[in-house]
Amino acid sequence: MNQGTKSILLAATLAAIPWQVYGSIEQSSLLPIPPMGFNNWARFMCDLNETLFTETADAMAANGLRDAGYNRINLDDCWMAYQRSDNGSLQWNTTKFPHGLPWLAQYVKAKGFHFGIYEDSGNMTCGGYPGSYNHEEQDANTFALWGIDYLKLDGCNVYATQGRTLEEEYKQRYGHWHQVLSKMQHPLIFSESAPAYFAGTDNNTDWYTVMDWVPIYGELARHSTDILVYSGAGSAWDSIMNNYNYNTLLARYQRPGYFNDPDFLIPDHPGLTADEKRSHFALWASFSAPLIISAYIPALSKDEIAFLTNEALIAVNQDPLAQQATFASRDNTLDILTRNLANGDRLLTVLNKGNTTVTRDIPVQWLGLTETDCTYTAEDLWDGKTQKISDHIKIELASHATAVFRLGLPQGCSSVVPTGLVFNTASGNCLTAASNSSVAFQSCNGETSQIWQVTLSGVIRPVSQTTQCLAADGNSVKLQACDSTDSDGQNWTYAVTGNLKNAKTDGCLTEGSVQMKSCLYERDGQVFGLPSGVQLS
């Protein structure tokens, strides 16, 4: 089958998928809000044992983490024996876990926690232990018998079988696990690591293809590189920023019942400053990403416990709307992100990526607040202080610090239009409006000309020129007066595949000279990030 035919068939398949249906048993109630808890990997890797987990459960129950919502304790790789039993069942390492995993499950449950486990979709785990390939039903039943309700399924040692591409092989294996879990009386939470094995290449097509199907099969997906482990070489902050940047490319996939997972929180990593640790937590909270701590819990400091149990930020993370914060603006120094919250409030998160303190005024119009003569209440979610703002909010941020504000919208001022960057996810370039009605893709520079409003009817207009609308005519794209007779040319739909399709031309926006071309499946030049809250077609 040639690539063109395959693209057409794949696009047709994606068009037929009911994107509101997610999760292992095709219901969002299995995991309506992101999970919170503990995993040993980034801190201890294979150096795990029974005592580590009992001490962790004891500490989390005593120091406020459990009561703050961190109610899951998950094993990672290296928990098992190197051989299955005579009947093919997995066995735990009896030296590391002398009382056994069923006993450990009972122990952590008695402390108020759920218990999760790790396996691999290949014939071996990443650490060289038995994988679940060809043992899926048996292993799922074993885990349930042991008292486990959460499965992280890795993707090491997966090889394409005859007649399948590697992406198709992963889809078959994770799809089979989805079927197995769906038949269980009490399905396990399904954390999929498949996308991580396709991230970071020169072409994102396979990565996005995997991202298209993981939300249908499970509740969360590890989408990119592992966070730096405690003993690893390199910069922990750079590792956090790497995973943060990957996560910003994927907001269109997230909704209640499915969550993008940029990997663990590492609050006791010695390579991080206090501001960097707090930023890590605040950014993941703003994303409504899983909050899974990988640290030596008994030794966490009071300050680390304090920010990890920040009620206001946890409330944002656990907000039932489950929107992922997206870029309102970005330049080389500041990232400004925003999203809606279920009660109608608006979130503002600002990250200083630079190496010096920055002061900036941020117009409320950049945050999607379009009403004039309104006064909003802005609550600082770090210290609880509030201030009244009207046309802008002033931010002062130290290097690598993150500010988070919750904006209350008074009656009569509650109108919000999804607002922010329209950027190509492969190049990172931002759609930019010019004063001569032309548009171009340029490096993101924090200018108002790169900030766009996207209305419910599919109209896209720059905040710098709100009487002008993005329009397509033939192969060209330009700005023209809104509400003109060419309304179809100003109407756009946004798909989960990242395509921005025009109603008049039936083509898709394409980076380059900013033009319309035939819509292709997950092609780099046609995959765009838009503000959260934009309706998917």
Curated annotation (Swiss-Prot):
Its main location: secreted. It is found in: Secreted. Transmembrane segments: none annotated. Belongs to the glycosyl hydrolase 27 family. Gene3D superfamilies: 2.80.10.50, Aldolase class I, Golgi alpha-mannosidase II. This is Probable alpha-galactosidase A. It is an enzyme of class 3 (hydrolase). Residues 413-537 form the Ricin B-type lectin domain. CDD domains: beta-trefoil_Ricin_AglA, GH27. One of its GO terms (molecular function) is alpha-galactosidase activity. InterPro entries: Aldolase_TIM, Glyco_hydro_27, Glyco_hydro_27/36_CS, Glyco_hydro_b, Glycoside_hydrolase_SF, Melibiase_C, Ricin_B-like_lectins, Ricin_B_lectin. It comes from Aspergillus niger (strain ATCC MYA-4892 / CBS 513.88 / FGSC A1513). It comes from the Eukaryota. Glycans are attached at residues 49, 87, 93, 123, 203, 355, 436, 491. Hydrolyzes a variety of simple alpha-D-galactoside as well as more complex molecules such as oligosaccharides and polysaccharides. Disulfide bonds join 46-78, 126-156, 430-444, 469-482. GO terms for biological process: carbohydrate metabolic process. Keywords: Disulfide bond, Glycoprotein, Glycosidase, Hydrolase, Lectin, Secreted, Signal. PROSITE patterns: ALPHA_GALACTOSIDASE, RICIN_B_LECTIN. It catalyses: Hydrolysis of terminal, non-reducing alpha-D-galactose residues in alpha-D-galactosides, including galactose oligosaccharides, galactomannans and galactolipids. Residues 1-23 form the signal peptide. The active site is at residues 154, 212.
